Amino acid sequence: MPRLQQKWLNSRECPTLRGEAAKGLFPTKDDPSAHKRMSPSDKDILILCCKLGIALLCLGLLGEVAVRARRALTLDSFNSSSVQDYNLNDSENSTFLLRQGPQPTSSYKPHQPCPSEIEIRMLAKNYIFTNKTNPIGRLLVTMLRNESLPFSTIFTQIQRLEMGIENRKRHSTSVEEQVQGLRASGLEVKRGKRSALVKIGDRWWQPGTYRGPYIYRPTDAPLPYTGRYDLNFDRWVTVNGYKVLYRSLSFRERLARARPPWCMLTQEEKNDMKQQVHDYIYLGTGMSSIWGKIFHTKERTVAALIEHYSAKTYGMSYYD
């Protein structure tokens, strides 16, 4: 006896043809295609694939959450050497910030992030703890969230920010003091309305605003909407005299440069476009009558002439 029948006989309910037909497994007189219905259709396979995809997505999300939780847990497990590097061990809040427990005596060490990451996080904690609204702290936090920038880049950003903060602090000094201090450095300086101005190249700059050489004047700049392509085949435009790659513009700026707006057209072109629209609406010219222009008959030509002259006579022009 085959194993399947043996299993059926040993089970409590012995399957009969009538019972299987009731389930829809065998064809009957009433339902001859019952056995075909049980084979999975394309729709069933699609639904199954969708369910599998959703399950995999959920697994991936769970894994991401677990990784982030582990990172957050290992964040505070810094060794004492990194504390001494930043001279935070003498501050009263360093133990509170680091929450250092007893170090493991065995040679086994748990996973620790790379030193640059430790340094960044230490800096971020230090800056944020001193002042919640500190722009450097906020910058560090955003960069940590990005998790893609090297430490050197972040350090240059911090230096720039610190320079900007110093410039803001110096702004409180009078213009005369600024002029005297800058003259001592041997630069060409003049007094401006709000601050001293330094001459770099052929332009006057406020202190802290010079961003490198001012490349393009409005005369030799490329067209502001179409732009040009440089030697690297990158499309670029000028923004306030600086070369800016098209791909680095914001979406709104790119959208604004997608086509020339009305202000790029001359007044004659604007009038011509308006007249074309007017003719299309009131005289029925345009693409609709293109077959009449190609295969024109005598009657159609006479009718068009009469229509045209009557429109001229009765002042149907857009500007009359």
From Swiss-Prot:
It is found in: Membrane. It is a single-pass type II membrane protein. Its main location: membrane. Glycans are attached at residues 79, 89, 93, 131, 146. InterPro entries: MMTV_SAg. Superantigen. This is Protein PR73. It comes from Mouse mammary tumor virus (strain BR6).
